[in-house]
């Protein structure tokens, strides 16, 4: 099992490989090792639109971390 945290200013759904699920930003996500394309649920008010990652060799205490930045309004 691998661990990922997707940071964003707001709580938002996280889309993994184009599949929405029960994942949320700012929480630890548990996924199998592998390559993933991470996006946020709408609205599209952030950059980048998608982040590709290779998830391997993580622990719950040292998860892979990515950040989406909210666009200026």
Name each model feature, range by range.
Residues 1-73:
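Short loop/turn and low-complexity linker motifs enriched in small/turn-promoting residues
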